Amino acid sequence: MVYNTSCLILPLALIILDFTLISSLAHPIPSTLNVLSYGAKPDGSKDSTKAFLAAWDVACASANPTTIIVPKGRFLVGNLVFHGNECKQAPISIRIAGSIVAPEDFRIIASSKHWIWFEDVTDVSIYGGILDAQGTSLWKCKNNGGHNCPTGAKSLVFSGSNNIKISGLTSINSQKFHIVIDNSNNVNIDGVKVSADENSPNTDGIHVESSHSVHITNSRIGTGDDCISIGPGSTNVFIQTIRCGPGHGISIGSLGRAEEEQGVDNVTVSNVDFMGTNNGVRIKTWGKDSNSFARNIVFQHINMKMVKNPIIIDQHYCLHKPCPKQESGVKVSNVRYEDIHGTSNTEVAVLLDCSKEKPCTGIVMDDVNLVSVHRPAQASCDNANGSANDVVPFTPCLKREIIIT
């Protein structure tokens, strides 16, 4: 007897397909993923790195929005890298009720440039929680002149990412920068707290580089370096309602370290309180040839309290001697200072040290009143051009506007 095998194959294939569909429906990816379910321990001593990565892999594979829960407790993790290039691009929220802590031995995470790194992700949000990088021992190593100290790891990094939200997060004791936004678009950072010792080296609070449409709001930052720094290639950055101190202020730069370098365009810094910082609002560029630029910058509605350099443009920036002897090639233009008041901890409250090669142009000051706590405040300026209205101290390089009413 001859059987028609084709008649058997088709029903069998349909049965297998039906079974696969039923299995997938019976075990859908849940919308909420608790890291405890993947082996994480909230005791601060067991390594939970693999558990966090496992939870991410499941969320990444979901075609629907998912939330990763980090409950109360202390979760010890090493270097975490969350890749997004193979995700289905559904929104992922990470809600942290407890603390994520790094190992006490700083060398464990310092072997990498990043402690917690999100790479090529889209629609990722982080809410609440504490990141404790336990960087104090590395700071001591560096401050004591140790030659074998590693550079250190940045605590939280987003690179090549889009539509990112960080809300209510606290970052403490970072080895290096606390929060880094690199080569990313549409980023909102709100209500974060950053804390590190004022002598902690290179611990910028929030650093933005090569990124576009970044909003930083309602945050308190006290650290050993810039509270917020805006690096090359950044555009459309909005900073509002910030308390900065201790720290080195809010900086555009440093720029011009490389000869071929993107510039910074369209930055607004508004409603900021500087408390005992080394600088207030600063633009810093290296004294060397470069095609970089800083333009269309607004600093407004700012209070200074015992700030060493409330307003400063430093186009001869240099960290370590010997310093370059060239003039800076970075072009600084269209910078507006408006409604800035308070006290300077030094005699020179306004320092505009611009490049001879490319003088600053379009510098506008309006309603600026800075007084020195020791003696009458002064302004020092070189190679700066622009206008001033109602400015104390008198800034001779800026023409006084005549207001006709």
Curated annotation (Swiss-Prot):
The active site is at D225, H248. The keyword Signal applies. GO terms for biological process: carbohydrate metabolic process; cell wall organization. Its main location: secreted. SUPFAM superfamilies: Pectin lyase-like. Keywords: Cell wall, Cell wall biogenesis/degradation, Glycosidase, Hydrolase, Repeat, Secreted, Signal. Its EC number is 3.2.1.15. Expressed in developing and germinated seeds in the chalazal region immediately adjacent to the site of penetration of the radicle through the testa. Residues 1-26 form the signal peptide. Transmembrane segments: none annotated. This is Probable polygalacturonase At2g43860. The keyword Transport does not apply. PbH1 repeats lie at residues 184-210, 211-232, 264-285.
